[in-house]
């Protein structure tokens, strides 16, 4: 009996001390949580009681060199619903169908969905948003948002690019400089009860958004308009497939205008242009959207034809294998190995100097010059002049040069390369390389971006683009400027001549592949003033109907552009 009492007493003591120990542990844990983890759990509790809604930040503007706004923002609204706050679901559904023009089935599905916040429609105009707000229905949210707006719509569309539904850049400058243009979104924090219903008489917490920075570019809206008007005119009159125009400063590579016509509508970037309307709603719609957005100035390559003779001549002068006084003879063709390669003048130019050979754009002269340089050295000049590398322009999707391997260049390949066939480069590559030859021999990097500015026009960042000095001698550059001025004043580029101005330039007519298609590219590359170039213009007309010679149809387009931009840039006669 005594043993049982002792046993029970011991059992009670163990239970008592266990309870005391557990209580002490729990109290200690509670004290620890209150003193050291209190803030954390307070925040967690608040998060359970708060609903977040984003406040979209305004995207930075894109400006031309003079501050003209090329891309900005338009205030719009995003309409959302919170299911467990809606008190009159049928009325809400009817109102949203009426105001937003969305099918009832789609609206009902979203209104009846059990989620904390369900978006109904974005990019709703402010007027409609205000009407929806005026209904005063519980559970319907109208939040401020921004939609990208392009004041000039089609102007420089393939350079500027556009943004997607999330307001992030997709192509063009919008994509390349997205990290500078995008802002930081703000937040609206709303207190809710356990059911997720907003608590009355408790204000919202707001974290204001921060707008993106502005991008100032080298584009000039007026020059872009001049170039676009000229491209449009040539496109219609020549019934061409497309027209590309590049206007740049050859001394630093700043692009003042870039047109690839037809352009697309920046404010409706997924709406096919008239030429592609037949593909709307078909399986090929996306393919033709991609074609419409493609910038052939940088994304595509082509055989440059006779404009490349500028580079062949510069390489020959650098190599010392030709002088301005050298004499040649053109019977209308030249035989290289077993290949008879004709001149565009099939009856021949007869006896001519090197200067006259350039004025006449004589193929046999340039084949002779190319053979003098030799395949190995010519390939070295491709490397020296930068032709084997991308230009590095600050636009996406630049294509690479398509060139024979050094060891695969025989005499026939060398002959055709010397007058701009059997290899391909981009238009921007041609414009950049010729700029570098005529500017004294400095290989520039073509670019559009200049600097990033905040809303107060304070410069945040200036972009520097590399320059490679000495790709050719100043003496070579001077001779090339002289030779190309003669092409316009006395040679095949005379249709680009403007009284009172010294303009240098070179014509080209090249055939596309396959040759059997008989499609041609007419082009003209010019610069002014010839003795101290401040502006270079490249015009490319693809597959024009009727006459297709560059000197006949591309040179007048070049002249029209120069007649507008030379006085505008105040370049003296």
What is the predicted role of each segment?
Residues 1-275, 301, 323, 376-388, ...:
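Periplasmic/cell-envelope proteins involved in peptidoglycan metabolism and beta-lactam response
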Residues 71, 193-204, 251-307, 311-543, ...:
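Beta-lactam-recognizing serine transpeptidase/beta-lactamase-like catalytic domain environment
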């Amino acid at each position: 009996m005594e043993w049982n009492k002792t046993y029970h007493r011991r059992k009670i003591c163990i239970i008592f001390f266990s309870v005391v120990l557990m209580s002490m542990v729990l109290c200690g844990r509670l004290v620890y949580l209150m003193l050291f983890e209190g803030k954390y759990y307070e925040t967690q509790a608040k998060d359970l009681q708060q609903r977040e809604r984003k406040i979209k930040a305004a995207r930075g503007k894109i400006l031309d060199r003079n501050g003209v706004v090329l891309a900005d923002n338009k205030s719009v609204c995003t309409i959302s619903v919170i299911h467990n706050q809606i008190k009159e679901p049928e009325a809400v559904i009817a109102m949203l169908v009426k105001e937003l023009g969305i099918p009832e089935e789609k609206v009902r599905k979203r209104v009846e969905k059990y989620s904390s916040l369900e978006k109904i429609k974005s990019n709703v105009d402010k007027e409609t948003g205000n009407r929806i707000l005026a209904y005063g229905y519980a559970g319907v949210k109208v939040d401020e948002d921004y939609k990208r707006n392009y004041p000039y719509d089609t102007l420089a569309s393939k350079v500027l690019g556009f943004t997607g539904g999330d307001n992030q850049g997709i192509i063009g400058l919008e994509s390349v400089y997205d990290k500078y243009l995008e802002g930081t979104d703000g937040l609206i924090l709303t207190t809710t009860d356990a059911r997720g219903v907003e608590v009355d008489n408790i204000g919202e917490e707001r974290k204001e958004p921060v707008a993106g920075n502005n991008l100032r570019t080298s584009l000039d809206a007026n020059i872009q308009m001049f170039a676009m008007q000229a491209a449009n005119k040539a496109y219609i009159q020549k019934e061409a497939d497309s027209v590309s125009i590049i206007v740049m400063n050859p001394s630093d590579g700043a692009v003042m205008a870039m047109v690839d016509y037809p352009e697309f509508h920046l404010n409706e970037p997924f709406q096919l242009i008239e030429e592609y309307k037949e593909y709307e709603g078909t399986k090929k719609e996306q393919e033709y959207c991609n074609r419409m957005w493609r910038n052939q100035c940088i994304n595509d390559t082509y055989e440059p034809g006779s404009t490349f003779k500028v580079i062949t001549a510069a390489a020959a002068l650098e190599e010392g294998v030709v002088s301005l006084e050298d004499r040649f003879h053109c019977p209308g063709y030249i035989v290289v190995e077993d290949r008879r390669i004709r001149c565009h003048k099939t009856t021949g130019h007869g006896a001519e100097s090197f200067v006259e050979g350039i004025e006449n754009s004589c193929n046999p002269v340039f084949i002779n010059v190319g053979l003098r340089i030799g395949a190995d050295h010519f390939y070295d000049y491709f490397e020296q002049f930068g032709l084997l590398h991308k230009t590095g322009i600050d636009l996406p999707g630049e294509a690479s040069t398509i060139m024979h391997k050094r060891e695969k260049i025989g005499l026939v390949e060398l002959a055709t390369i010397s007058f701009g066939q059997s290899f391909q480069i981009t238009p921007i590559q041609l414009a950049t390389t010729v700029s570098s030859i005529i500017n004294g021999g400095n290989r520039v990097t073509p670019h559009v971006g200049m600097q990033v500015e905040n809303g107060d026009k304070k410069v945040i960042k200036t972009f520097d683009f590399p320059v490679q000095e000495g790709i050719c001698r100043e003496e070579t550059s001077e001779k090339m400027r002289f030779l190309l001025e003669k092409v316009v004043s006395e040679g095949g580029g005379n249709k680009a001549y403007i009284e009172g101005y010294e303009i240098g330039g070179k014509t080209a007519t090249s055939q596309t592949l396959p040759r059997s298609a008989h499609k041609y590219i007419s082009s003209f590359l010019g610069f002014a003033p010839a003795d101290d170039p401040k502006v270079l213009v490249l015009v490319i007309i693809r597959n024009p109907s009727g006459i297709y010679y560059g000197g006949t149809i591309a040179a007048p387009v070049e002249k029209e552009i120069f007649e507008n931009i030379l006085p505008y840039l105040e370049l003296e006669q």
